[in-house]
A protein has these predicted regions:
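Hydrophobic alpha-helical transmembrane segments of multi-pass integral membrane proteins
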Residues: 1-397
Length: 397
């Protein structure tokens, strides 16, 4: 019976990768809560146990679960064999678990498993690159940009590992690595998948809908994000206006051109639209933060922009895409019932609460309290969502 379950669980790549992603998302968030509640003391910085873990451990596994399914379909190639994606999964799972445990018990060896994780990531990149090269599909723009973003992630990951060495510019390099990993890797992959899949999902519900997408949209955004990474290295939010204003207007203009039929689609689709709008809100918030830095520098915006994207955009889309993929590939009807809609709404409340946490100290409120409250609620929502959807994954098909 166990063998039968094992075969079902690994019958599709998204099942083990999504399960692992949600597991480590929960574990690293619990670790974060324990540290900020003074229950646990770690001898590493938040860049490692929170930023690094989210960028290169958690979100990466969600991506691969999705990419290992859709990449061959995009390029009209044979599905990735179970033997290959199982090999990748076990490498990611083992190294992720070792990173998590080493951070708690012996952080001096964490970098060893980071190196192994990077090597695994390189093999995943090569796998996707080979599929891209073999394809005879003429238009491969979307998969090309996924690979470009993935390669940027490899460089960012390598830089972060190098920053573990104790030298004069190690902290500076670690920040460059996290910023480039966040924007050039995560943000670009999310954006590339979003502009490919969301109009596609929309047409499934509204057949006459046409999204007028700009051919050079991804290229322009990528160049501006490189500019943003350079500007962030100066550690002065006033300069962010140089990159954020053009990105804000370009993405806003693009989304307007898509003419998304908000009131003609079901919850399983409009939650994806909501995730897209967080891109615009995130850059708008960044612009507001920069103006405050110029005219009233006493106002503090603690990581508000990063979490606008990480929770508002990334996590909303992960839950939205994840729900749809899990239902569709398990033979269930692709519909968000009342339970799922409540999860969607609760997640948006948590995003707003995290943004409020970023500015609450300006009103004399307890920042740590609201930060921990947000993290605890987020873990609870993930567990509630998992009680239905990860259960489906664990059953397998």
């Amino acid at each position: 019976m166990l063998f039968s379950w094992y075969k079902r669980f690994f019958s599709q790549p998204h099942q083990p990768f999504f399960t692992s992603g949600i597991l480590f998302f929960t574990l690293f968030m619990i670790l974060f809560i324990l540290v900020y509640s003074n229950i646990l003391v770690l001898d590493t910085s938040i860049l490692t146990y929170h930023a690094y873990s989210m960028v290169f451990v958690v979100f990466l596994q969600f991506f691969l679960g999705f990419l290992f399914v859709v990449f061959p379909k995009f390029l009209m190639q044979a599905e990735i064999s179970e033997k290959i994606y199982k090999r990748h999964f076990f490498a990611y799972f083992f190294n992720s678990l070792c990173i998590f445990l080493s951070l708690i018990f012996y952080s001096k060896i964490t970098f060893v498993f980071q190196i192994f994780l990077l090597i695994t990531q390189i093999f995943s990149f090569k796998l996707l690159l080979d599929i891209h090269k073999k394809s005879l599909v003429q238009i491969k723009n979307d998969t090309k940009w996924v690979l470009i973003a993935f390669f940027a992630g490899l460089i960012s990951h390598f830089l972060f590992i190098i920053s573990n060495l104790d030298f004069k510019y190690s902290f500076f390099i670690s920040k460059i690595a996290i910023n480039s990993g966040f924007y050039l890797f995560l943000f670009m992959i999310f954006l590339t998948i979003s502009q490919r899949m969301i109009p596609f999902f929309t047409r499934a519900k509204v057949p006459n809908h046409v999204a007028y997408k700009s051919l050079k949209f991804l290229k322009i955004v990528f160049i501006l994000l490189i500019l943003k990474i350079v500007i962030l290295s100066f550690d002065d939010v006033r300069f962010n206006l140089i990159s954020d204003i053009p990105i804000f207007f370009i993405i806003t203009k693009e989304l307007i051109k898509w003419k998304l039929p908000i009131f003609k689609v079901e919850a399983i689709i409009w939650i994806l639209y909501l995730g897209l709008y967080w891109i615009v809100l995130g850059f708008f918030i960044s612009i507001i933060e920069s103006f405050f830095a110029i005219y009233n520098s006493s106002i503090y915006f603690e990581k508000i922009v990063i979490h606008s994207f990480a929770l508002g955009y990334f996590l909303t889309l992960l839950i939205g895409f994840g729900t749809r993929v899990i239902l569709g590939h398990s033979g269930n009807q692709i519909v968000a019932n009342r339970f799922t809609v409540i999860i969607f709404i609760a997640l948006q409340f948590i995003v707003l609460l995290r943004l409020f946490s970023s500015i609450c100290s300006n009103f004399g409120l307890d920042y740590i309290f609201f930060l921990n409250l947000t993290a605890i609620l987020l873990v609870l929502v993930l567990l509630v969502w998992s009680s239905k959807y990860i259960t489906i994954l664990l059953k397998g098909k």
